[in-house]
Amino acid sequence: MRTRIFALFLAVLLCIIGGKMDSQAKRPLSSYSTRSYDWGLGQNLNHKKPNGTGPAGWKCKKDHAYYIGKCSKKNKVVYLSFDCGYEAGYTKKILKTLKKHHAKAIFFVTKDYIMSNPGLVKKMKKEGHLVGNHTTHHPRMAKLSVKRIQREIKECEKAMKKKTGFKMDPFIRPPEGNFSMRSVKVAKSMGYSTIFWSLAYYDYDTANQPGKNFVIRKFKTYYHNGMIPLIHACSKSNTEALGEVLAFLKKKGFRFGT
């Protein structure tokens, strides 16, 4: 009788352990879809959170992917984000304006940017900003192999430490907003959160700038709680508008979080 009871107990125990092993088994990263998505936004009406693009039913937060920051009715926050693919001579002015308004931000930098502007990147960190990963070669990420995605992230990360002495903050912005389930999963496996945006406009062409007033109107028309604006640091219009934008948002009761 005791033997039968022990055997039954052992069988149940093995089932429990086996179930845990199955649930904890890691799916190979290479098995995730490489279907390409380009991040975009639905129309943002009445200062409400816009809808983003992605796979149907995708719960992006489960994959550590975000386009709206943490906020509440009592805690109104804007999360300023700047993309730095190359330096056009405006970043010092941007940093000065942020400091004047006591505003913190995250700067997403490429390896080339780090290598060419280590002093500026150090300044970002020393002034309390986050510095995130914008990859090594600025590729469209969706179709890349697992190893290539890892290399794009890791080499930029290594350059950050080598050239500035600072560790890269664990946030990545995929170039051009291009992603797949594979690229997001690989970033997550490396300890990164993928950061998209909830406000963007045509600002990255240095030869065809939208103008200071256009930028200000965009923020006044489409601001919302938890907003993550995509701001290219190479833009003259953004640089000229930033002070007025920050003053407007503060007047509306927002603080600037990271």
Regions found by a protein language model. Name each.
Residues R2-D22:
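Sec-dependent N-terminal signal peptides of Gram-positive bacterial secreted proteins and lipoproteins
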Residues G18-S81, Y86-K96, K100-H102, S116, ...:
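N-terminal pre-catalytic segment of deacetylase/amide-hydrolase enzymes
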Residues M21, S116, F179, S237-A241:
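Short phosphate-engaging motifs
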Residues K76-V78, A88-Y90, K99-N213, R217-I231:
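Metal-dependent polysaccharide deacetylase catalytic core of the NodB/CE4 family, i.e.
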Residues K93-L95, V184-K185, L242-G243:
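Short amphipathic alpha-helical segments
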Residues Y223-T258:
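Catalytic grooves of carbohydrate-active enzymes
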